[in-house]
From Swiss-Prot:
Residues 24-216 are extracellular. It comes from Sus scrofa. Residues 240-254 are cytoplasmic. GO terms for biological process: adaptive immune response; antigen processing and presentation of exogenous peptide antigen via MHC class II; peptide antigen assembly with MHC class II protein complex; positive regulation of immune response; positive regulation of T cell activation. Keywords: Adaptive immunity, Disulfide bond, Glycoprotein, Immunity, Membrane, MHC II, Signal, Transmembrane, Transmembrane helix. The lineage of its organism: Eukaryota, Metazoa, Chordata, Craniata, Vertebrata. It holds the Pfam family MHC_II_alpha. This is SLA class II histocompatibility antigen, DQ haplotype C alpha chain. GO terms for molecular function: MHC class II protein complex binding; peptide antigen binding.
Amino acid sequence: MVPGRVLMWGALALTTVMSACGGEDIAADHVASYGLNVYQSYGPRGYFTHEFDGDEQFYVDLEKKETVWRLPLFSEFTSFDPQGALRNIATLKHNLNIVTKRSNNTAAVNKVPEVTVFSKSPVILGQPNTLICHVDSIFPPVINITWLKNGHSVKGFSETSFLSKNDHSFLKISYLTFLPSDDDFYDCKVEHWGLDKPLLKHWEPEIPAPMSELTETVVCALGLIVGLVGIVVGTVFIIQGLRSGGPSRHQGSL
């Protein structure tokens, strides 16, 4: 990746569901981005997504020319014609070519992405789980995310499209289904113009070390001692209670 290349991006038909008289001091209950369009000059690529409250609803695969829903269930309630996205991207490409010819271009500032890896649910050995690689603060939106298992590349992972943020950077999430084992470790590999070299974010299951026989013996002995002390203390209190209450039963009027 060459960080010196020029990247320009545009957004058309970007709608934010907020109050008509709103301002920065008014917080919206829900925010939706309809038709976020991005086209980049480094290659024939672009992005078209719909988002709601920061979550992707769908994106349009510009190569396959089809709508890809974040959850298949969404397609049962509504639909979207990908031709609209293709027309928007074509318009962006045309306008970008004009702008680059008529203006002095400056290279975009490359941000260093922030990478976090965690499991979807608590790890239990032998139980299927999902690893999540959360890549934040992406700009420009050009990135390659892959997974390594024990140092070797693996396939079968999925990822979201670029999700927009208020600071005009992006985030992207990659998912890898795996079977936890104490013999395996994983790395999320991120390549981006803001990095001098590929970044590997390491993850391996945190399995409590088994107690040694000596530790088990000590724990059992302590438990037994505590139990015996409790019995002795309880017996002493019972005897004292009987003694203090005994004479009162023999007292009477003369």
